[in-house]
Amino acid sequence: AVLQLYPLSARETPKVSLLRGGYPDALARPAGARLWFASYLQTYLERDVRAVTAVKDLATFRRFLALLASRHGQVLNRTDLAAPLGVSVPTITQWISVLETTAQILIVPPFYENLGKRLIKSPKVYLADSGLACHLLGIDSAAELAKSPFAGSLFEGLIASEIVKAQVNAGGRRELYHFRDEQGLEVDFVFPGRNGSLTLVECKAVRTVTPAMAAPMQRLRDAARKQRPKEAAVNMFLVHQAPMVKSRTEAVAPGVRALTWRDFLEAM
């Protein structure tokens, strides 16, 4: 049996970062992280993948990983993944299952609650470790990460991974969803809490936030309140990167707390 074990969380070590992720060996020797990730991928492909499935073409599977990294944070489209690799959609489905079984990816399903809206019903996919995602995308330095068109989706994936690790490490169920409707309203993450509460999270890979960034959460909160008990709280967090100068206030919009991602994890 394959043990589903996630990398270290930011609660477990402050060394966890967007660029390096949470694998202990990559964090222990940052200068050698690139070599370690390359070795890890080779070991993972030759040992773990073969242990759970009869993948015959490891080279194509390796290309699949890189392609999946380029779709990090997007709605999962198996046909879109199958075509450039020249494999079938059932093969992609099997490979996705392998990655999920071995805790290499997170599949974030759409929020299920009926809010009177026509919802996008496809899940989103993230690599479980941001360091591995950066490696697969060829991002090896903070400067490259800052300029990368993937910076936003990588940051979003880091938050997804940290939320799931916090839930699992606390002995709870993994419950993380995304929200997107056909009118274009989108909130990065939604998860239920105690006493029927709901937490909405919007992720921004920026150091300065604005009230407009919180608007989608406020719209979803208003829709949720019409369908939920009045006493059920709806918590909203605008999660961002650490500013150069610490902000004096967390309040960015009515009912919304703007927190750095590390502060958000403490407040969860």
Which residues does each PLM region occupy?
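Short amphipathic alpha-helical interaction segments
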Residues: V87-T101
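Interdomain motor-coupling "hinge/lid" segment immediately C-terminal to the ATP-binding subdomain
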Residues: A1-T79, A103-Q104
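A cross-kingdom feature that marks ATP-driven nucleic-acid transaction machinery
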Residues: V98, Q104, P109-M268
